[in-house]
Amino acid sequence: MESRGAADSQDPSAFLSGITGASVTVKLNSGVVYKGELQSIDGYMNIALEKTQEFVNGKLRKSYGDVFVRGNNVLYISAD
């Protein structure tokens, strides 16, 4: 079994707190992707983004100032 380095042992909560204010990609269960600046996230994975772009089937569909995503719709969050 391979051991992990210190960087890999960070818990998800600490990771998400550390990327607040950074550019992120949020993919929803529906396949829609939002790219924007992470403003806040709570224990239910509810997410607030600013300067957000919405992508459907890989194509830019719309740009928003602010977006709120309910946590049960989130498939994953990725730091850009």
Curated annotation (Swiss-Prot):
Alphabetical keyword list: Cytoplasm, mRNA processing, mRNA splicing, Nucleus, Ribonucleoprotein, RNA-binding, rRNA processing, Spliceosome, tRNA processing
GO biological process, one term: mRNA splicing, via spliceosome
CDD domains named among the record's database cross-references: LSm6
Compartment list: Cytoplasm; Nucleus
Assembly: Component of the heptameric LSM1-LSM7 complex, which consists of LSM1, LSM2, LSM3, LSM4, LSM5, LSM6 and LSM7. Component of the heptameric LSM2-LSM8 complex, which consists of LSM2, LSM3, LSM4, LSM5, LSM6, LSM7 and LSM8. The LSm subunits form a seven-membered ring structure with a doughnut shape.
Free-text function comment from the UniProt entry: Component of LSm protein complexes, which are involved in RNA processing and may function in a chaperone-like manner, facilitating the efficient association of RNA processing factors with their substrates. Component of the cytoplasmic LSM1-LSM7 complex, which is thought to be involved in mRNA degradation by activating the decapping step in the 5'-to-3' mRNA decay pathway. Component of the nuclear LSM2-LSM8 complex, which is involved in splicing of nuclear mRNAs.
Protein name: U6 snRNA-associated Sm-like protein LSm6
Organism: Coccidioides immitis (strain RS) (Valley fever fungus)
